[in-house]
């Protein structure tokens, strides 16, 4: 998602066009359709077989990449243009300005939406059940087929998903706090009584 996100902020109309085409095509189609296309459609067109877990990983990765590209673009464009001008005026190239001035500031702003996207991607893995990937939802279905205890099994599956998403959220929140150290506003000093 970083490469198309950077391409979408590029001065090159060609790079921007490719990035926009990718982002809009992926965001404009449901993930389930992308999974089915990668597992059933593409292999027919190419005359090859793609294992279900490989197709699933590619589908989730490509889908996530489109959303991450927009997160990257938004974070970069949220940085004041004066930052770029300041970097350029000190003699930095466009790439150096992006790497040393814009990117560190933009990355801090990306953490909350990236956390959200990471959690969404984890939950989206449940859609891979349609192509036979043996993930958590599939395992739940198989257990229910044996013991017919749907309530307990689906409750357990939900608890597992909740535990995973809360863990991811906690880890990324920790890193967000680490990156924000030294970025908090300094409290105003008390006014001088002698003035």
Q: Which sequence ranges carry the predicted segments?
A:
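Transmembrane alpha-helices and adjacent helix-loop boundaries
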Residues: 1-195
């Amino acid at each position: 998602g970083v490469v198309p996100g950077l391409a979408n902020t590029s001065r090159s109309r060609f790079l921007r066009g490719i990035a926009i085409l990718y982002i809009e095509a992926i965001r404009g189609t449901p993930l389930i359709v992308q999974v089915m296309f990668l597992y059933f459609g593409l292999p027919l067109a190419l005359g090859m077989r793609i294992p279900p877990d490989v197709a699933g990983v590619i589908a989730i990765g490509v889908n996530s990449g489109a959303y991450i590209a927009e997160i990257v673009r938004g974070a970069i464009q949220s940085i004041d243009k004066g930052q770029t001008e300041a970097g350029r005026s000190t003699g930095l190239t466009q790439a150096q300005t992006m790497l040393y001035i814009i990117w560190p500031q933009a990355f801090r702003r990306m953490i909350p939406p990236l956390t959200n996207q990471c959690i969404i991607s984890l939950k989206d893995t449940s859609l891979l059940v349609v192509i036979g990937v043996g993930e958590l939802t599939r395992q739940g279905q198989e257990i229910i087929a044996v013991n017919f205890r749907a309530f307990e099994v689906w409750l357990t599956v939900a608890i597992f998903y909740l535990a995973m998403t809360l863990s991811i959220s906690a880890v990324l929140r920790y890193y967000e706090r680490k990156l924000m150290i030294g970025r908090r506003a300094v409290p105003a000093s008390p006014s001088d009584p002698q003035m």
